[in-house]
């Protein structure tokens, strides 16, 4: 952990969650310090996306507690959790195709009048949008829509960012740009990040720690700068 990291920003204790007929997360406990980035890795169907949706309140908790910056959000609806300072970029594209790029970026702002100031801050990280704000988001490529989700999350200036496979299907140059944006966000604002990622080099670059999920449980974890971290991660993904 760096010196910028502080008290626990995201704390899950004994969280059990799932869908109507199935339990996916099984008494999962984990903590993320303020300013820290943790990468969640594992094969598909192991509970990673369920974990983020549970944190955001999209799935009911059957047991356990979730705290955001010390506040119990276990029973709060998604919009209240967002107001508590949590921004979520889901795996599926959540872009409003018929709205302009500008209007998509404004959606997460409590005060729409803050757009110009926020975009002046975030826009240079995503130059593809700077001259296209009036265009419909539906004109963007799949990769550009992913970047729009990330830019929208950064515009909110949250204390916690949740990202679900934001690099999936992207070109290496775009992945590098996203890594730079996340590192910038963490350095400038001390933002806490919890991200699901299958692109291991990206995870190792932007995260301080990693956790491997299997069948809704954390089966391994470590620091990304540990010798052998990459091999440990790949060994779980290969099995």
Show which residues each predicted segment covers.
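The feature captures the beta-strand-to-loop junction immediately N-terminal to the Walker
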Residues: 41-43
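Helix-to-loop junction immediately C-terminal to a conserved catalytic motif
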Residues: 56
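ABC ATPase NBD coupling module
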Residues: 60, 72-92, 131-134, 226-233
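Conserved ABC transporter NBD signature motif
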Residues: 64-71, 84, 117-118, 124, ...
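Conserved ABC ATPase signature
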Residues: 136-140, 144
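ABC ATPase C-loop
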Residues: 153-154
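Walker B catalytic motif
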Residues: 165-166
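Helical segment within the ABC ATPase nucleotide-binding domain
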Residues: 176-189
């Amino acid at each position: 952990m760096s010196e910028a990291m502080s008290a626990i920003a995201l704390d899950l204790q004994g969280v059990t969650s799932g869908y109507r007929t199935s339990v996916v997360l099984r008494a999962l406990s984990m903590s993320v310090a303020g300013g820290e980035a943790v990468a969640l890795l594992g094969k598909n169907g192991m509970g990673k996306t369920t974990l983020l949706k549970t944190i955001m309140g999209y799935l009911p908790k059957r047991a356990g507690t979730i705290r955001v910056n010390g506040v119990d959000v276990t029973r709060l609806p998604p919009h209240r959790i967002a107001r508590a300072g949590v921004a979520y970029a889901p795996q599926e594209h959540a872009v409003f195709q018929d709205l302009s790029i500008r209007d998509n970026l404004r959606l997460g702002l409590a005060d729409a009048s803050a757009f110009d100031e926020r975009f002046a801050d975030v826009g240079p990280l995503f130059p593809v949008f700077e001259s296209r704000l009036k265009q419909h988001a539906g004109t963007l490529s799949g990769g550009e829509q992913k970047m729009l989700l990330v830019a929208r999350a950064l515009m909110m200036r949250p204390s916690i960012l949740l990202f679900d496979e934001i690099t999936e299907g992207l070109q290496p140059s775009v992945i590098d740009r996203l890594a730079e944006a996340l590192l910038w966000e963490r350095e400038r604002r001390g933002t806490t990040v919890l991200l699901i990622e299958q692109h291991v080099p990206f995870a190792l670059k932007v995260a301080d720690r990693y956790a491997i999920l299997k069948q809704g449980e954390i089966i391994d974890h470590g620091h990304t700068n540990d010798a052998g971290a990459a091999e440990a991660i790949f060994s779980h993904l290969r099995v």
